[in-house]
């Protein structure tokens, strides 16, 4: 009986902590886009049987060039998602964009997942499957072509997409590295935008 009482007390404490974390995080929810890519139930075999918990892969971004991916694990789905969101916010990085698309084609690989991303003209939209689309939309990429060339495992695809986005290099940096004027390496869309802005 004492053991059951301790378990009940611990469970109520966990619920209170979850509620407090949820209340603290709620004001920030409007500032970020959150996409739950996959939720998986896992089991750990212990002396008394199997103990179930949930894992959640979450993508968080500001829709304006910042994105991160997090992995959360907890006894309940909402808590796993909340942990994933916090983990994603710790791993934010900046995605170079040119007129709503990416500056150049790129391939990202993670385990057996391989993702190809290519720039697209304005109005094309995000041509991508679920996991890739979640990352690109949270990053604020509006026009892009993509193709998954490897595993269809959502976790691998998401991490491959993140690696591809991290490998992008802004045209300005390419010009400096090569010692060339920006006009020779930048996409025409960027040059037109700079001309219209008078930069």
Curated annotation (Swiss-Prot):
Residues 1-29 are annotated as: Disordered. Residues 12-27 have a biased composition (Basic and acidic residues). Residues 32-95 form the S5 DRBM domain. GO terms for molecular function: rRNA binding; structural constituent of ribosome. InterPro entries: Ribosomal_Su5_D2-typ_SF (IPR020568), Ribosomal_uS5 (IPR000851), Ribosomal_uS5_bac-type (IPR005712), Ribosomal_uS5_C (IPR005324), Ribosomal_uS5_N (IPR013810), Ribosomal_uS5_N_CS (IPR018192), Ribsml_uS5_D2-typ_fold_subgr (IPR014721). GO terms for biological process: translation. Keywords: Ribonucleoprotein, Ribosomal protein, RNA-binding, rRNA-binding. GO terms for cellular component: small ribosomal subunit. Part of the 30S ribosomal subunit. Contacts proteins S4 and S8. The N-terminal domain interacts with the head of the 30S subunit; the C-terminal domain interacts with the body and contacts protein S4. The interaction surface between S4 and S5 is involved in control of translational fidelity. Belongs to the universal ribosomal protein uS5 family. With S4 and S12 plays an important role in translational accuracy. This is Small ribosomal subunit protein uS5. It comes from Acidothermus cellulolyticus (strain ATCC 43068 / DSM 8971 / 11B).
């Amino acid at each position: 009986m004492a053991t059951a009482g301790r378990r009940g007390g611990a469970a109520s404490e966990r619920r209170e902590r979850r509620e407090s974390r949820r209340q603290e995080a709620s004001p920030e929810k409007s500032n970020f886009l959150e996409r739950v890519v996959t939720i998986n139930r896992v089991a750990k075999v212990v002396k008394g049987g199997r103990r179930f918990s949930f894992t959640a892969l979450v993508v968080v971004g500001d829709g304006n060039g910042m994105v991160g991916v997090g992995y959360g694990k907890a006894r309940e789905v909402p808590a796993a998602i909340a942990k994933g969101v916090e983990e994603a916010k710790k791993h934010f990085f900046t995605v170079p964009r040119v007129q709503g698309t990416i500056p150049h084609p790129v391939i990202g690989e993670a385990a057996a997942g391989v993702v190809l991303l290519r720039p697209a003209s304005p109005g094309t939209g995000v041509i991508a499957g679920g996991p890739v689309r979640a990352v690109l939309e949270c990053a604020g990429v509006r026009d892009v072509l993509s193709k998954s060339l490897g595993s269809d495992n959502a976790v691998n695809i998401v991490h491959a997409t993140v690696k591809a986005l991290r490998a992008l290099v802004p045209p300005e940096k390419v010009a400096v590295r090569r010692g060339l004027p920006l006009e020779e390496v930048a996409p025409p869309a960027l040059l037109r935008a700079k001309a219209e802005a008078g930069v």
